[in-house]
UniProtKB/Swiss-Prot annotation:
Its cofactor is [4Fe-4S] cluster. Pfam families: Fe-S_biosyn, NifU. GO terms for molecular function: 4 iron, 4 sulfur cluster binding; iron ion binding. Belongs to the NfuA family. It comes from Vibrio vulnificus (strain YJ016). Homodimer. Involved in iron-sulfur cluster biogenesis. Binds a 4Fe-4S cluster, can transfer this cluster to apoproteins, and thereby intervenes in the maturation of Fe/S proteins. Could also act as a scaffold/chaperone for damaged Fe/S proteins. The keyword Cell wall biogenesis/degradation does not apply. This is Fe/S biogenesis protein NfuA. InterPro entries: Fe/S_biogenesis_protein_NfuA (IPR017726), FeS_biogenesis (IPR000361), FSCA_dom_sf (IPR034904), HesB-like_dom_sf (IPR035903), NIF_FeS_clus_asmbl_NifU_C (IPR001075).
Length: 194
């Protein structure tokens, strides 16, 4: 069974929407381009004739959510919520594993660090149009990274590296990583955030 959470507020929202659809209509949760940097998650109506034998059904009180076989591992730990604030209401879908499959706790260090970068570090950098890529981990436990996008040439990259990325990764991989170093040849330009 997949670990997808649909909050009570989102369930109520879906139930209201589905009440206006033909009987037997449910929802489908999916990932387009799963496992890539271009991964995008979505929710759509799922009429009975669109259910495939390989789909996983996740039953809720007044509807079911169907997930296709390919999307399922990339929706691990996903959460769908319906948030209301003074600006209005909106459906939110958070899927930390959409761009990269969750790795096992006993996976090689390189895979675990890459996973942490893709799911924890890059979403924070994306707000500035930037990203970081793990190039290698040395025998001395130094993670070598390269910045791209808005981070390349940014005057704040040293602070981002030391106070953000390195601090987070050293805490998470205590005893395994000793440092994080930047291998980027920074080229300041219009693409740079600061």
């Amino acid at each position: 069974m997949s670990n997808i959470t649909i909050t009570e507020a989102a369930q109520t929202h879906f139930a209201n929407l589905l009440g206006q659809q033909p009987d037997g209509t449910n929802i489908r949760v999916f990932v387009v381009n799963p496992g890539t940097q271009n991964a995008e998650c979505g929710v759509s109506y799922c009429p009975p004739e669109a259910v495939e034998a390989t789909d996983t059904e996740i039953p809720y009180q007044s509807f079911s959510a169907y997930v296709d076989e390919l999307s399922l591992p990339f929706l691990e730990d996903a959460e769908i919520d319906y948030v209301t604030d003074k600006m209005g209401s909106q459906l939110t879908l958070k899927a930390p594993n959409a761009k990269m499959r969750k790795v096992a706790d006993d996976a090689p260090l390189l895979e675990r660090v890459e996973y942490a970068i893709q799911t924890q570090v890059n979403p924070q950098l994306a707000g500035h149009g930037g990203h970081v890529k793990l190039m290698e981990i040395t025998d001395a436990g130094v993670a070598i990274v390269a910045f791209g996008g808005g981070c390349n040439g940014c005057s704040m990259v040293d602070v981002t590296l030391k106070e953000g990325i390195e601090k987070e990764l050293l805490q998470q991989f205590s005893g395994e990583l000793t440092a994080v170093r930047d291998a980027t040849e920074h080229d300041r330009g219009d693409h740079s955030y600061y």
